[in-house]
């Protein structure tokens, strides 16, 4: 049987657990399980946290105290370990099991666990301390012995005696490869003909660098990391959420979740690494360099996936902290508060039975040492009907509908049910009024049937009539690209009604009212669609795990990726001046919008009216608003008919993209509340099709081409939309343009002869040349006006946002300041004087509100100077390129 530890705060209402502030969050509720965010695979796939280990990654070893001059390794564990009786609830830790230290963690001071041989997923016959097989064949650590691995113990003793202060002890030494191979062969030979305890490393080599390399190779072949696959998420969340002081206290309890063999190996390896770090002056290896080498030994996910790159720095910080604070972490944990309580659910143990069980395991704290009042409180807590996880790290959760009696019945009647859920990850308590609960195996939840969810016909509302002026404008766009123009302009008409529904409130999903109540839409309920994915070959628990992974994947990864793809498309459209390319880009957004509208309504009975109602009730955060409301109205008097159409298509694309972001935001918040697996699968299919549409190349690209090919062609084609410019310039190659330069500047360079062989002799363009390129004038005028308008909006928003919003504005201001200073340096211009720093206000928010407005004024002055520098014929073509590209970058960064 499996067990896990659930933590909860003490409550003053007779032991009723306090409400967790995140317990009802639709964004966080889905990660309260063993297979949380860190175990996600691609959309719709299962990341099996119990898969086979990666032979290329390191695995932990154990070092024991040497009888010589090695430093003592703190450990409260006993060498005694027993197999539990059928009534015990412990598992050995293997590739798919997790060790239980329920009793140990309950008392808060033990470091020894017992294991049930009947439920172990590891063949314990392999765990022979005198095993003479190939030690480099991936033999697992014995979880039932004090040291876990005898050969690892020998490596540690050897290096603690004569190698911990050797320079570069764990660095690669290619010149020693031959000696390393010879020592390995002789070691395997000695072990095959004798007892492992009798083997001596000193007779094989006197070079500690050789033993250090062999030790690393041994660790690399261990099948599971020292902290186990199951605790991967717990360690990352503990490090990310808790303060440095609380981390050390919490890590002590995480250590209790591992078998005694693993704990001994961890203390052995960390004892050696800590000693090497202490002698970093001679070894030339500190905690940081050691953490980079050994972080995979202690922590790695079961599957090395894309998110591992972002996790790697955190893993190194965790191992670095363990190395530096090893003496502190290795001490037995104690209850941080005398008011901490322990509840054992699902058992009928009396005080005498608890004492007897404690006496059977000498390493566990003596129950009799606890006061009688505390024991009585423990037994009274058994009758509580609901258990909740700690609000800080909600890794486990028990449904409130399950009482302790039902838990007990389930455990007694089906202790080895093949459908029992996997062991959930533990939770770490904060260092304040805490109540620790040891909870038995979570019973199987009843599967909801589609008939229990009524399907209501959503009430759709007719959109308001489209203005006649808009229709006339659309009808005027029927020329060469009639079909494409009509489709895009119709998108503009259909989506104009969304403008009033998009609020630029700086509200993050975590700050939404959805955190405190369940999402619902009046008069609307999701109907269960027919699932195309077959779960017939999966068990009920595997289906639940798969659905949970899909939920978390859509919530945390897929929705953000889709939003980023849309933003990149809008950026490409805004910077594009080729009419045909604009049509192709906008057609992709049009198809994506059509897919979201039709698929959502067909598979989930979601209409645009439902989405609009949801957005009105829960406004989108600023990052999801893709409509640029501050764009000044351009004077289109001198525009050609084709330029007017291109401008209309750009605005229609913005409206369509904003409507897609409405759907993405809706699913991001609602996915965690879907009860039926068919709803989750349909949502995953919708997002999968959306990503394929957004990632597809434009229709005109040949098969096998990519977006990068299209963008390169777009940047190198010198096609001018102005009929007055000579078309012969399109035959020149724009090879000298920077990768970040826009197609506009490519045309400007070509028209000014920058691609000719006499580049160095080219004089700055005359006023007539600059005036002739209307695109250059437009882009500088529009960007400067938009940027200054955004500064005005930031100034007004600064007066009503909270401290977090003010920090965001300050962060964007810092970026703008850096870019503008870069322009002045590259163009060799004299910057305006810096703003005099104001004295700090009463608090941070007041200080920001005083300091940022003068900075906005300075930005406006700098932008005016740069535009005049171009229009007054003082800028060279290179300077124009820099100014235009930087202004585009500032405008885009502020709009996001």
Swiss-Prot record:
Residues 1-97, 375-514, 701-770 are annotated as: Disordered. GO terms for molecular function: GTPase activator activity. It is found in: Cytoplasm. SUPFAM superfamilies: GTPase activation domain, GAP. Residues 10-26, 45-57, 65-97, 375-391, 400-427, 448-460, 473-506, 712-743, 751-761 have a biased composition (Low complexity). Keywords: Cytoplasm, GTPase activation. Residues 27-38, 702-711 have a biased composition (Polar residues). InterPro entries: Rho-type_GAP, Rho_GTPase_activation_prot, RhoGAP_dom. It comes from the Eukaryota. Residues 139-330 form the Rho-GAP domain. Induction: Down-regulated by phagocytic stimuli. Transmembrane segments: none annotated. The keyword Cytoplasm applies. GO terms for cellular component: cytoplasm. The record marks 171 as: Arginine finger. Its main location: cytoplasm. One of its GO terms (biological process) is signal transduction. Pfam families: RhoGAP. Rho GTPase-activating protein involved in the signal transduction pathway. This is Rho GTPase-activating protein gacM. It comes from Dictyostelium discoideum (Social amoeba). The lineage of its organism: Eukaryota, Amoebozoa, Evosea, Eumycetozoa, Dictyostelia. The gene is gacM.
């Amino acid at each position: 049987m499996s067990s896990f530890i659930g933590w909860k705060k003490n409550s003053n209402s007779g032991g009723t657990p306090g409400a967790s502030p995140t317990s009802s969050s639709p964004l966080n509720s889905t990660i309260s399980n063993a297979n949380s965010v860190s175990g996600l695979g691609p959309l719709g796939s299962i990341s099996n946290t119990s898969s086979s280990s990666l032979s290329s990654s390191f695995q932990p070893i154990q070092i024991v105290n040497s009888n010589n001059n090695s430093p003592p390794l703190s450990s409260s564990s006993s060498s005694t370990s027993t197999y539990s009786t059928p009534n015990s609830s412990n598992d050995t830790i293997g590739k798919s099991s997790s060790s239980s230290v329920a009793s140990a963690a309950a008392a808060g001071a033990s470091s020894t666990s017992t294991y049930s041989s009947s439920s172990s997923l590891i063949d314990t016959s392999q765990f022979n301390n005198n095993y003479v097989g190939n030690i480099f064949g991936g033999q697992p650590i014995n979880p039932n012995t004090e040291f876990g691995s005898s050969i690892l113990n020998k490596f540690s003793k050897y290096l603690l005696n004569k190698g911990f202060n050797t320079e570069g002890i764990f660095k690669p030494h290619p010149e020693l490869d031959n000696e390393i191979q010879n020592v390995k062969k002789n070691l395997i030979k000695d072990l095959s003909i004798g007892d492992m305890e009798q083997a001596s490393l000193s007779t094989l080599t006197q070079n500690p660098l050789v033993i250090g390399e062999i030790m690393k190779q041994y660790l690399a072949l261990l099948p599971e990391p020292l902290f186990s696959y199951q605790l991967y998420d717990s360690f990352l969340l503990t490090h990310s959420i808790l303060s440095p002081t609380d981390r050390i206290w919490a890590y002590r309890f995480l250590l209790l979740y591992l078998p005694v063999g693993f704990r001994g190996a961890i203390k052995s390896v960390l004892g050696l690494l800590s000693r090497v770090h202490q002698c970093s002056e001679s070894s030339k290896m500190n905690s940081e360099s050691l953490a980079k080498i050994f972080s995979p030994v202690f922590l790695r996910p079961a599957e090395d996936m894309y998110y591992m790159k972002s996790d790697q720095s955190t893993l190194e910080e965790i191992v670095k902290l363990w190395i530096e604070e090893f003496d502190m972490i290795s001490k037995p944990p104690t209850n941080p508060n005398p008011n901490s309580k322990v509840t054992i659910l699902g058992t009928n143990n009396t005080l005498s039975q608890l004492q007897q069980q404690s006496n059977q395991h000498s390493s566990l704290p003596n129950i009799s040492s606890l006061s009688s009042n505390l024991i009585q409180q423990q037994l009274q807590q058994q009758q509580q009907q609901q258990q909740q996880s700690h609000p800080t790290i909600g890794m486990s959760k028990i449904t409130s509908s399950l009482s302790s009696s039902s838990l007990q019945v389930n455990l007694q009647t089906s202790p080895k049910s093949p459908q029992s859920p996997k062991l959930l990850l533990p939770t770490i308590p904060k260092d304040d009024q805490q109540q620790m609960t040891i909870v038995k195996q979570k019973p199987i939840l009843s599967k909801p049937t589609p008939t229990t969810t009524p399907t209501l016909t959503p009430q759709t509302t007719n959109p308001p009539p489209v203005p006649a002026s808009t229709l006339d404008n659309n009808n005027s766009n029927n020329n060469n690209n009639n079909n494409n123009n009509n489709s895009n302009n119709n998108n503009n008409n259909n989506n104009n009604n969304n403008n009033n529904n998009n609020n630029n409130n700086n509200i993050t999903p975590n700050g939404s009212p959805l955190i405190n109540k369940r999402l619902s839409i009046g008069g609307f309920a999701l109907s269960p669609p027919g699932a195309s994915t077959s779960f017939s070959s999966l068990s009920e628990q595997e289906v639940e795990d798969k659905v949970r992974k899909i939920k978390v994947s859509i919530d945390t990864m897929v929705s953000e990726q889709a939003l980023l793809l849309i933003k990149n498309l809008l950026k490409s459209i805004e910077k594009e001046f080729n009419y045909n390319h604009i049509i192709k880009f906008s057609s992709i957004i049009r198809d994506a919008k059509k897919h979201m509208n039709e698929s959502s309504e067909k598979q989930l009975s979601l209409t645009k009216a439902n989405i609009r109602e949801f957005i009105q009730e829960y406004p989108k955060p600023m990052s999801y608003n893709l409509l640029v409301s501050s764009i000044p109205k351009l004077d289109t008097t001198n525009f050609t008919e084709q330029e007017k159409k291109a401008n209309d298509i750009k605005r229609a694309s913005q409206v369509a993209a904003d409507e897609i972001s409405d759907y993405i935001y809706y699913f991001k918040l609602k996915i965690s509340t879907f009860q039926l697996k068919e709803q989750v699968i349909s949502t995953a299919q919708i997002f999968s099709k959306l990503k394929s549409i957004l990632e597809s190349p434009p229709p005109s690209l040949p098969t096998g081409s990519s977006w990068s090919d299209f963008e390169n062609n777009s940047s190198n084609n010198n096609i001018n939309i102005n009929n007055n410019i000579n078309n012969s310039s399109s035959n020149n190659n724009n090879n000298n343009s920077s990768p970040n330069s826009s197609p506009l500047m490519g045309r400007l360079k070509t028209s000014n002869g920058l691609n000719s062989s006499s580049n160095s002799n080219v004089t700055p363009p005359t006023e007539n040349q600059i005036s002739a390129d209307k695109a250059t004038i437009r882009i500088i005028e529009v960007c400067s006006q938009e940027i200054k308008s955004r500064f005005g909006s930031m100034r007004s928003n600064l007066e009503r946002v909270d401290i977090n919003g003010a920090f965001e504005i300050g962060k964007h201001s810092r970026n703008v300041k850096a870019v503008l200073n870069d322009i002045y340096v590259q163009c060799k211009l004299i910057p305006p004087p810096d703003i005099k720093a104001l004295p700090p206000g009463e608090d941070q928010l007041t200080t920001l509100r005083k300091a940022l407005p003068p900075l906005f004024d300075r930005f406006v002055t700098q932008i005016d100077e740069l535009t005049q520098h171009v229009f007054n014929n003082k800028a060279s073509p290179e300077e124009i390129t820099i100014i235009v590209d930087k202004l585009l970058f500032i405008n885009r960064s502020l709009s996001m």
